[in-house]
Amino acid sequence: MWTYRCKIKKVVDGDTVDVDIDLGFGIWQMNERVRIMGIDTPESRTRDKIEKKFGLAAKAKLKSLLGPNPVLQTTISKKGEDMKGKFGRVLGDFLIEGKQVTEIMCKTGHAVPYFGGSKADTQKQHMKNRKKLVAEGVVKGAIE
């Protein structure tokens, strides 16, 4: 694991962020897409209107945690020489005041733990999270 400072450019969805990574000594890796490793969030870019509401809530939560465009730390996992996942994104997690974003997103019901495999396995937890977010008033108008 390596830790880098980075600057948030854009929150794409609840588990994907575009960043500039400070490699040190004034060297920056620009415009990298980071997949937050270890979680799955509802899709915000989908035709399913109900899922989209929860996906947009996850995106908003992540954006509020990271701030508008701050410099943060991100821990990037590296298997061998491969720092990127199957879709070419850097795999990592962000640290906010010493806490991992993955933990916060799961605790608040905006994400579920996910380490590959079938997304069908995570669906039960997503449904529990939906009920929690509706009950707390985080997501409104989500009728199933």
Segments and roles (model prediction):
Residues 1-144:
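Small beta-barrel nucleic-acid-binding modules, primarily SNase/OB-fold domains
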